[in-house]
């Protein structure tokens, strides 16, 4: 079953953020756009490259009024040490969520039971807590977080402009499409 246009289910997890431990719930996501980025585990190889990419794009997320949450199946205690020891992860200014009970990874369909890890999944969630984009793929392939920013902005645009769609490779400020009978066969 697709998670697109479904409400984020209730949850409560702990995270490491800005030098302290915090609690994150589904209510934490409401009132702003949110991006959940699931990763297999702390202290791995591709995960720090993605966190660094997210950190390098964090200004774009903030300009768009969105918060980023990194989620692994480790504890928030592990994330504290990871943040303190990894130069790439140390750049993160967003919450690093620990999901050792697999509450979130199961709810978002990215849990790998036989490994106790998460698949690489990315979810853009609107201010009402509704999932608008889903990307899940193999753990051997790291994501381009710049593409996640593009998808966030496209989701925001279409939310603000009902009846319009963002074509392939659409970037903020570019022309969109208004589907109609007149467009059929002309694109």
From Swiss-Prot:
InterPro entries: AhpC, AhpC/TSA, Peroxiredoxin, Peroxiredoxin_AhpC-typ, Peroxiredoxin_C, Thioredoxin-like_sf, Thioredoxin_domain. The keyword Cytoplasm applies. One of its GO terms (molecular function) is thioredoxin peroxidase activity. It catalyses: a hydroperoxide + NADH + H(+) = an alcohol + NAD(+) + H2O. GO terms for biological process: cell redox homeostasis; cellular response to stress; hydrogen peroxide catabolic process; response to oxidative stress. Its main location: cytoplasm. Residues 2-157 form the Thioredoxin domain. Its EC number is 1.11.1.26. Keywords: Antioxidant, Cytoplasm, Disulfide bond, Oxidoreductase, Peroxidase, Redox-active center, Secreted. The keyword Cytoplasm applies. It is found in: Cytoplasm; Secreted. It is an enzyme of class 1 (oxidoreductase). The active site is a conserved redox-active cysteine residue, the peroxidatic cysteine (C(P)), which makes the nucleophilic attack on the peroxide substrate. The peroxide oxidizes the C(P)-SH to cysteine sulfenic acid (C(P)-SOH), which then reacts with another cysteine residue, the resolving cysteine (C(R)), to form a disulfide bridge. The disulfide is subsequently reduced by an appropriate electron donor to complete the catalytic cycle. In this typical 2-Cys peroxiredoxin, C(R) is provided by the other dimeric subunit to form an intersubunit disulfide. PANTHER family: ALKYL HYDROPEROXIDE REDUCTASE C, THIOREDOXIN PEROXIDASE. Homodimer; disulfide-linked, upon oxidation. 5 homodimers assemble to form a ring-like decamer. NCBIfam families: AhpC. Thiol-specific peroxidase that catalyzes the reduction of hydrogen peroxide and organic hydroperoxides to water and alcohols, respectively. Plays a role in cell protection against oxidative stress by detoxifying peroxides. Belongs to the peroxiredoxin family. AhpC/Prx1 subfamily. This is Alkyl hydroperoxide reductase C. It comes from Pseudomonas aeruginosa (strain UCBPP-PA14). The lineage of its organism: Bacteria, Pseudomonadati, Pseudomonadota, Gammaproteobacteria, Pseudomonadales.
